[in-house]
């Protein structure tokens, strides 16, 4: 009976994973700038056959190392030129992280129910789901940080020198791959997480003795590529270390500057549909640090990165994704250890929180659709889009309501709360947002004109990357704004990849002699103010914030 229930729960989790993570993956447009950027970088890597130096729009792009791109490359190589392939590496990394969470729970507590619950909490947490189905590098670096956490547990449990060497070697492999995915950050997070555990358990000597092995392994793993990219591009490491790391995280003008408390609401919303478990799980990690040292270890791996990112001036909500694997383990362990009556009461509180959360969001979408708030977000004729958005959260409410049934196992049905959101969100985005963040629709609507253009320009890197991806050509020229390609455009061989607004009329007059020209703009407002002073086009196509100016070839 017990084995049968475990098999049933495992099957349900696999089906839920497929419905949440795989089925909707190809049905959503790529978001700009992140998804269009990573899609195009890997497309160009495959096209060029260059897996060493990343390029975007044929311009050097030094913002990240290459391991994340490699996973994206493999996905596109195996699965083709689709939105599914663009996002699959993120989903694959999230699935492997969930497997590590499952195995780690089994290792720590020898209980398959707790292990399944930990994996379920991880996969269905709102922030994990949102980032895990989105093409960015954070799910991949999270995979390696979860592997580093797993290695740390192996280190703690090792009794023989050989076991310690193996565990520290695995830590080095995980850190090395993390470094090759997102840089020095992947070395800092394990250090700040391991150190308080070593101090609390008086194992500093062991850390100093065996820790260098992890460093050596990480260096050996990353050295071939690090040396190869240096040989090809001598200033890669200067840019990557000083600009990408020091300026982004520490300086006053850091990119994505945000206050210290920024991650508190992100954490609260991101843990839905399991929010009620958060306070007790964190408290137990500290309160039971002596009786259950593994919980203190998990607490350190959750809290220390969170503090690190909170102190850093540059912040993005994706940064704290590595905190969710240890948090899911803490939650599963804590609720599994409660007395049945207390557990049932907690699950009911959790269900009510989800009921309130879903209701508020359903009402918010309805208010947006009716124009009560932000009256210009939805346009006339978008009734189905509004209904779809409301149903996303009505589904959340429905699962929360069903989970309120007075039966011990029903409380866990909140795991299904994100299901309707996952399946319907692609059809719930208002056209005004699609035509500012999802360039694929606009590009496909005017693909014949764009494909008939010898020269294609864009005033935003994310939009330009979307054009390159859809048209399968990397020679998109940037117009007026350099954006994140500013550094790469300073190279002499990239001088012709940017056209200033003042120089555009003369540039256009010259280029029109050899072919059609298409200029695609993303304007700030739904007016002609930003392009009225440009040379008059032969055709003008506009949809909300996207504008296409088409100039026909003229006789020489």
From Swiss-Prot:
GO molecular function terms listed in the Swiss-Prot or TrEMBL record: 4-amino-4-deoxy-L-arabinose transferase activity; mannosyltransferase activity
Pathway: Lipopolysaccharide metabolism; 4-amino-4-deoxy-beta-L-arabinose-lipid A biosynthesis
Record field: catalytic activity: 4-amino-4-deoxy-alpha-L-arabinopyranosyl di-trans,octa-cis-undecaprenyl phosphate + lipid IVA = lipid IIA + di-trans,octa-cis-undecaprenyl phosphate
Membrane topology summary: Multi-pass membrane protein
Domain of life: Bacteria
Pfam family, any one: PMT
Enzyme Commission numbers on file: 2.4.2.43
Subcellular location: Cell inner membrane
Annotated keywords: Cell inner membrane, Cell membrane, Glycosyltransferase, Lipid A biosynthesis, Lipid biosynthesis, Lipid metabolism, Lipopolysaccharide biosynthesis, Membrane, Transferase, Transmembrane, Transmembrane helix
Entry's Gene Ontology cellular component terms: plasma membrane
Broad EC category: transferase
Family annotation (InterPro entries): ArnT_tfrase, Glyco_trans_39/83, LipidA_mod_glycosyltrf_83
Membrane-spanning segments: 5-25, 88-108, 116-136, 179-199, 207-227, 258-278, 296-316, 319-339, 355-375, 384-404, 410-430
Gene Ontology biological process terms in this record: lipid A biosynthetic process; lipopolysaccharide biosynthetic process; protein O-linked glycosylation; response to iron(III) ion
Family label: Belongs to the glycosyltransferase 83 family.
Function: Catalyzes the transfer of the L-Ara4N moiety of the glycolipid undecaprenyl phosphate-alpha-L-Ara4N to lipid A. The modified arabinose is attached to lipid A and is required for resistance to polymyxin and cationic antimicrobial peptides.
Database matches in NCBIfam families: PRK13279.1
PANTHER family assigned: MANNOSYLTRANSFERASE YKCB-RELATED (PTHR33908), UNDECAPRENYL PHOSPHATE-ALPHA-4-AMINO-4-DEOXY-L-ARABINOSE ARABINOSYL TRANSFERASE (PTHR33908:SF3)
Protein name: Undecaprenyl phosphate-alpha-4-amino-4-deoxy-L-arabinose arabinosyl transferase
Organism (species): Pectobacterium carotovorum subsp. carotovorum (strain PC1)
Gene: arnT
């Amino acid at each position: 009976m017990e084995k049968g229930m475990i098999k049933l729960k495992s099957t349900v989790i696999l089906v839920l994973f497929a419905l949440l993570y795989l089925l909707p993956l190809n049905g959503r447009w790529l978001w700009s700038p992140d998804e269009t950027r990573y899609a195009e970088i890997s497309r160009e890597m495959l096209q060029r056959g260059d897996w060493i130096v990343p390029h975007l729009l044929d311009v050097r792009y030094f913002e990240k190392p290459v391991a994340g791109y490699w996973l994206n490359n493999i996905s596109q190589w195996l699965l083709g030129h689709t939105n599914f392939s663009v996002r699959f590496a993120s989903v694959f990394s999230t699935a492997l992280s969930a497997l590590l969470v499952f195995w780690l729970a089994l290792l720590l507590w020898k209980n398959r129910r707790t292990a399944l619950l930990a994996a379920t909490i991880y996969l269905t947490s709102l922030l994990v789901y949102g980032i895990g189905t989105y093409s960015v590098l954070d799910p991949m670096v999270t995979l390696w940080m979860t592997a580093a956490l797993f290695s740390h547990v192996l280190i703690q449990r090792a009794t023989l020198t050989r076991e310690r060497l193996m565990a520290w070697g695995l830590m080095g492999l995980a850190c090395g791959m993390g470094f090759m995915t997102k840089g020095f950050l992947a070395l800092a997070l394990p250090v700040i997480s391991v150190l308080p555990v070593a101090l609390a358990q008086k194992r500093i000597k062991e850390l100093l003795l065996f820790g260098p092995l992890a460093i050596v392994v990480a260096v050996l793993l990353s050295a071939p590529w690090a040396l190869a990219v240096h040989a090809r591009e001598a200033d890669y490491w200067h840019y990557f270390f000083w600009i990408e790391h020091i300026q982004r995280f520490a300086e006053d003008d850091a990119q994505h500057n945000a206050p210290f408390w920024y991650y508190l609401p992100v954490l609260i919303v991101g843990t839905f549909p399991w929010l009620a478990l958060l306070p007790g799980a964190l408290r137990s990690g500290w309160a039971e640090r002596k009786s259950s040292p593994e919980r203190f270890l998990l607490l350190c791996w959750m809290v220390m990165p969170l503090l690190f990112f909170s102190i850093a001036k540059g912040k993005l909500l994706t940064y704290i994704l590595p905190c969710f694997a240890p948090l899911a383990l803490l939650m599963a362990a804590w609720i599994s250890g409660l007395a049945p009556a207390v557990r049932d009461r907690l699950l009911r509180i959790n269900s009510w929180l989800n009921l309130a959360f879903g209701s508020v969001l359903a009402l918010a979408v309805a208010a947006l659709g009716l124009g009560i708030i932000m009256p210009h977000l939805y346009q006339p004729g978008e009734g189905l889009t509004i209904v779809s958005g409301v149903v996303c959260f009505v589904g959340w409410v429905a699962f929360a309501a069903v989970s309120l049934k007075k039966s011990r196992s029903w409380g866990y049905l909140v795991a299904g709360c994100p299901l309707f959101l996952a399946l319907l969100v692609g059809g719930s985005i208002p056209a005004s947002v699609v035509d500012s963040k999802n360039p694929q629709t606009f590009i496909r609507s005017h693909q014949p004109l764009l494909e008939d253009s010898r020269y294609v320009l864009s005033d935003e890197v994310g939009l330009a990357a979307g054009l390159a991806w859809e048209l399968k050509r990397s020679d998109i020229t940037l117009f007026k704004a350099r954006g994140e390609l500013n550094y790469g455009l300073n190279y002499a061989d990239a001088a012709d990849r940017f056209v200033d607004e003042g120089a555009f009329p003369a540039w256009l007059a010259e280029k029109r002699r050899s072919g059609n020209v298409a200029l695609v703009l993303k304007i700030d407002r739904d007016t002609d103010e930003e392009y009225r002073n440009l040379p008059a086009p032969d055709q003008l196509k506009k949809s909300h914030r996207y504008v296409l100016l088409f100039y026909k070839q003229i006789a020489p």
